[in-house]
Structure formats: C-alpha cells, structure tokens
C-alpha cells in the first residue's frame, strides 16, 4: 500500500472506530433518534471517504501493474474496475 494513502486510511479507520463507539453509547444512553441518525450518516460519509482512498491505492498500484502486464491481466483489471463501480452504485 502506498505509504501516504495507508497513513490516511488508518487515520480514517480510527475516526470511524470512534464514531461507531459514539453511536453505541448514544443507543445505550437512549439519545434522541435524530441525533443518532445524524451520527450514522456521518459514519457513512466517512466510509465513503475511506473507500475512495482504498480505490485510489488499488488504481495506483495493482491496476497499473495489471495494465502494464497486458493480455489477460489487463482484462482482469478491467473486470475489477467494473466490479468496484457496480459495488459503489449499489451502496
């Protein structure tokens, strides 16, 4: 994994961990539902941010290598890109 992206992804994952603990506490404390929903929507945004970093890393490393190899590896890279695109559109 690219060092800078890894650092940013770990930072984002740690933020998410804290946000999830916060939601758990809010539920346990029976916080106002809209406040909990607001926090869960923030978590979804954070997850999208993490996913963007992971996709960027994959494109800059694995996909680039697969394209450079050519042939069936290039086709595999395209298949992976389509899969990621489809997964993103389902979310």
Q: Which residues fall in each region the model found?
A:
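Solvent-exposed interaction patches of small proteins and small membrane subunits
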Residues: 1-91
């Amino acid at each position: 994994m690219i060092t800078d992206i890894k650092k940013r992804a770990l930072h984002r994952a740690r933020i998410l961990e804290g946000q999830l603990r916060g939601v758990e506490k809010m539920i346990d404390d029976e916080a106002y539902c809209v406040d909990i929903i607001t926090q869960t929507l923030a978590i979804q945004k954070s997850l999208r941010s993490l996913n963007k970093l992971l996709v960027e890393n994959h494109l800059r490393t694995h996909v680039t290598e697969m394209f450079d190899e050519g042939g069936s590896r290039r086709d595999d890279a395209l298949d992976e890109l389509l899969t990621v695109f489809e997964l993103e559109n389902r979310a």
